[in-house]
Every structure is written in C-alpha cells, then in structure tokens.
C-alpha cells in the first residue's frame, strides 16, 4: 500500500482490498503502518481519535463486521493527551468489536541518508509501555509496529506471552528497508520460532518520504513463504500453526535460555 495524505482515499483503498481478500476466504487482514494517513505531525493531530471512538474507527468496525473478517490496522493516531498521540495498532474482530490495541513502544527518532533525512516520531507520538497479544481464529497474535523490529527483547516477551504469530506493520524507509528489513524479520522468526508477517508501506509519499515495501510472510524456521515487491500488492498465505509446535519441540530454545534467567536472578539480589 502507498498511503497518502487523503484519509478518504486511503480508507476507500483499504475497503476495496478488504472486500477482495474476503472473497478469497481470508480470515485475517493486516494493513501497513500509517495506512489511514501518511503525513506530518499536524495532520495526525487533526484526524486523531479517542480509542474506540470516532468516525474512522466506526467505519473500520463496520467493515470488519459486514465482511466477517478480523481486521488489523497497522497504526492509527489515538489521543494520549492534549498534545501527544499514540501510534496504535488496532485489532477488530469479525463482529466489528475493537478487541485489542497496541501502542508503539519504540519511536523512530533517527537520521537516515535519504531525502527526508531526519525522523522524529517523538515530536508527535508518546511511547507505548505494554506488549500486547490477542487470541484470534488463526492463532495467538503478538503485536508490534515498524521500528520495534530492531528490539528483539520485545519479541521474546511476546513469545513468552504465547504468541505464535507476530505482526509487523511498517513503513521502513527505502534505505533502511533495503539494508535490514528481510534480515530483521527472518531473525525475529528464527529467534522466537514463530510466524512473522511483515506488512510494509511502499513507494513515494509526501515530504520526500520513500518506503521499501516488500511485505512478506515468514515461517517459524525462518523461510520466506511469500513476498511482495516495491509496489502495492496483496499477499495471501495459509498459516500452519503445527509448524510452530514442530520447530519448538525439535529445538526447544526457550527452555535452554540462560540470559533471561540470569537477569531475573540479578533483579532478585
């Protein structure tokens, strides 16, 4: 998806793709980060809504209910206080209920060698504080957003909380995406022996932003099952949860973990 600065156009595109994917029998549909709006801090403030309130969330809930599918919105600006927002991943069930949300914990405050140059998400957003997992018909989902991908301990926690599928809606820059996107996704899948679904923005956006795309689904062994390119596309994959059990049983790395036990023991001393 190549989201722009027109919310109605982005929402219309999401609806079109959602209708097409549900015709194919998809039980769970995930959009990229910033899928409803890809713009600047002021624009996010304008469209931001209170959690589980407002016309945009109402429309998304209505679509999920009408089409009888679980819908994960990669990120949407949710108000945290008068001046700041959360970049929140929203999960709607097939009855249209908002059943989970995750506030992005790691904000992208970095310098990138591209036309945009300096990125400061903390100018607009507040840091989330809580990992989030949710049971769905396709498995237990662990939620994360974009820059979170570089912080493996978060994913260890998601696995400890029972996640067997990890979602990574993102808007990786073209520069960082080319260098690290696939490597990081596969690493998180291998480390946690879980399915990883990376859903990326792609193409050119306003404010000299270019995103990498290349959405992909990775199995618990780290194999890329299906992959997109640098242009908008829909990826469809069958998630086989028995592979999670198979890999974890054959190589029980969680029970072999010593570092987390060491840290926990130090905290008790």
Feature names for model-found ranges:
Residues 73-75, 88-91, 132-134, 215-217, ...:
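Short beta-strand scaffold segments in enzyme catalytic cores
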Residues 81-161, 174-176, 183, 249-253:
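Active-site catalytic loop in hydrolytic enzyme cores
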Residues 44, 90, 101-108, 216, ...:
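Short beta->alpha transition motifs characteristic of CBS
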Residues 1-5:
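Short polar catalytic/cofactor-binding loops
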Residues 7, 11-95, 101, 172-188, ...:
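Cys-nucleophile CN-hydrolase/nitrilase-fold catalytic domain and related Cys-dependent amidase chemistry
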Residues 52-72, 140, 146-235:
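CN hydrolase (nitrilase-like) catalytic-core segments centered on the catalytic cysteine
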Residues 47, 102, 134, 199, ...:
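Hydrophobic residues at beta-strand termini and immediately following loops
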